[in-house]
Amino acid sequence: MKRKICKALICATLATSLWAGASTKVYAWDGKIDGTGTHAMIVTQGVSILENDLSKNEPESVRKNLEILKENMHELQLGSTYPDYDKNAYDLYQDHFWDPDTDNNFSKDNSWYLAYSIPDTGESQIRKFSALARYEWQRGNYKQATFYLGEAMHYFGDIDTPYHPANVTAVDSAGHVKFETFAEERKEQYKINTAGCKTNEDFYADILKNKDFNAWSKEYARGFAKTGKSIYYSHASMSHSWDDWDYAAKVTLANSQKGTAGYIYRFLHDVSEGNDPSVGKNVKELVAYISTSGEKDAGTDDYMYFGIKTKDGKTQEWEMDNPGNDFMTGSKDTYTFKLKDENLKIDDIQNMWIRKRKYTAFPDAYKPENIKIIANGKVVVDKDINEWISGNSTYNIK
């Protein structure tokens, strides 16, 4: 929040100075705001691969949903490039990185990073946007759902690159941008058209075995990220040759396309079968996705909290305070809350609320637009608020 101005300034200084001299493009696979570039190629080929690999035994509902997805292909492409242009994003793209061996992005693992560590990672972003996509799809909002799915696949593509799962940034190596430019310029020759099997064979069949969506998604992503990280050290650093880079781009871009096809296959089965990833699962964490109104002065610098009360009367509350500026007019902010009692089911939570506490004697009013709460890969609360919250106030959302 703005009140933590010192570290915000540190982060801003890093953003302007550490990336200087490398490039203004500090993200992973290239992508343009109009839905073109390497990221868009990956998702487009992912759908094409799945269509080519579809077994004749696939349920009609899956086929129908695949057709709906194809009808919204441009939204998938736009979503796949949007995270690199999102005005709400972290300046250093910290949440686009994920080391599959440490479960961290570079803000926790790299010694040169002196500002706040960022809890979100490329892997957690995949799960968040997949949950939002599934929720909107089941409501019939296919356009928005497909855009969210594209965002999820952006992060999946990021953690398949050699540099992002190795937590090697443009600060650590000039090769970060150079390699991804190399891949972008040659992306057409790295296209694949099949995962090498039909959807009733091992690769796709294994994708459907684990009904715990969060657990499946994390381990599925981990497998591809480990390959990308290994390729960085064996073929993609600045010490490697052009032939090595060609091999690295060929392998990791093929993995991105194949992995995307598999992820979309899981998504289509989940929405076609009405799978509820949260049934019977203990809730270890809650993810809040909060939209602040775009109305003038809707944001706040006051303290903001999220709390729950369980049926046995116990309460837990967390401060919502991301590094830098959050709760700004028109912003969308994400917060992850770890529960003390890991044996809770979602139905054990009786009440949820957000609370505002004055930071100064002259508090801001705050106008949230919407809040969604995600548990175990499912949106369990979707609350339109659109009310001004003034002073020291509590707003119940459940």
Curated annotation (Swiss-Prot):
Instruction: Tell me which positions the record assigns to the signal sequence.
Output: 1-28
An example molecular function term from Gene Ontology annotations: toxin activity
Q: What is the effect of changing residue 39 to S?
A: Loss of all enzyme activities
For activity, the cofactor(s) needed are: Ca(2+); Zn(2+)
Q: What region holds the Zn-dependent PLC domain?
A: 29-278
Q: Which domain of life is it from?
A: Bacteria
Tell me the outcome of changing residue 91 to N: In strain: KZ1340
Q: What range(s) does the PLAT domain occupy?
A: 284-398
Q: What is this protein called?
A: Phospholipase C
Q: Which gene encodes it?
A: plc
